[in-house]
Amino acid sequence: CTMCGRCTTVCPMGIDIAELVKEARHGMFVAGLVPERLALMDRAARQWGSPATPGEDLPDILDEVSKQHGVPIPCDLERADILVTAAPAELSDHTKALAAAAKILNRTGERGTMHQGGFDASNIGFNNGDLELQEKLTRALVDTAVKIGAKTVLLPECGHAYGAAR
């Protein structure tokens, strides 16, 4: 379960299933019953701000994605109207989604940027039930958006990014 909430939208009883899963995972986290792979991702996110890659690697990753798809993807602009975020897979295996977003922003003339300070919207803390980490990662996105003057945070369709950011 990615806690995307799609099941909730079709539940005939109106039960917020994703919220139930979130609460169950939080209880398991508090009890120390997180699977080791998720615990490893939790530790990486605490250190790097992402379970998959350190923020300092973001400029090089975006440069590679830009070359691969022939579209500029701004990184670390001091001012931007839109903070662009991604799920880890969009920075490695599924770069077309990120390139498509960059093409749309470039075509419409919107000033968007990804930023080392807050770029990963997947929020492993939300997935693991680690509420402290969830808040830290969400706060990084919000603080980065405020820092660069962004009025919009563009979230990926990773399943639970919106729920985590809310």
Positions of PLM-derived features:
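Iron-sulfur-cluster electron-transfer modules
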Residues: 1-164
